[in-house]
Structures are given as C-alpha cells and as structure tokens.
C-alpha cells in the first residue's frame, strides 16, 4: 500500500460491480473500503466487530434484528451508522448508492454467519483498487 492521497470519486469510478468493496487505504488494522450498492445484500452477523457505514451518495437502509425486535434505519447521503457487533443486519439500497465502510482488515462482507449468498453479492474481504 502506498501512502498517497486517494480520490474517492476516482476510486468509485474505477469499478462497476455492486456489493463488491474496494480497499482505498488502511488505518492501523482497519480497512477503509468504498462500494457501490443497489438492491438487497443479505442477512448476516459480524460476531467480533462493529461495522461502520458512511453514505457518500444515494440512500442506504439497514434492517436490524435486535433484542427488542426488528427495525430499519434509513441513511440518506452524508449519514453515518454503526452496526454493533453481534447484530444481525441486512443492508438495502433502493437507488444506486455509494458507501464508505470501516472495518478490521480481513472482515468478510458476509460476516461470520449468513444466509445463502446471492449471485449479485461478492463474498470478499475487499479488493485492491486498480
């Protein structure tokens, strides 16, 4: 990894796949990833880590299954949200959306436990830019 400025717009323009994040940089032992998303992801859980979302463009909804029941958070452009570790969640983008994620290096996009992975979701720990 080189330590040079990275344009998020350029990074996002470098790929077209949805639900297939690219690693733009690392901070300590965390990846900073960008992704294009649209439609549904899948229900999944990260047992040992929180998951941070920043909506750069579009709108992201995250369905959550919590002790008190199910709820959905709506994140318009410019919003952030952290899904706590151990919380089952399912992201959904009703329109083409661009997001930034912060999670420990090596964290799978489908978590530690998940339902069947649909063809349009890339089960990965992130791809290098370029």
Summary of predicted features, one role per range:
Residues 42, 79-90, 97-99, 107:
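Histidine-centered metal-chelating micro-motifs
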């Amino acid at each position: 990894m080189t330590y040079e400025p990275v344009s998020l717009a350029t990074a996002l323009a470098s790929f077209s796949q949805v639900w297939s994040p690219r690693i733009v940089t690392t901070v300590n032992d965390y990846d900073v990833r960008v992704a294009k998303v649209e439609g549904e992801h899948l229900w999944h859980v990260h047992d040992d880590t929180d998951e941070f979302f920043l909506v750069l463009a579009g709108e992201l909804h995250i369905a959550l299954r919590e002790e008190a029941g199910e709820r959905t958070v709506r994140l318009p452009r410019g919003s952030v949200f952290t899904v706590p570790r151990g919380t089952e969640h399912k992201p959904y983008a009703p329109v083409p959306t661009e997001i930034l994620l912060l999670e420990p290096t090596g964290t799978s996009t489908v978590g530690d436990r998940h339902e069947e992975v649909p063809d349009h979701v890339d089960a990965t720990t992130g791809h290098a830019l370029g």
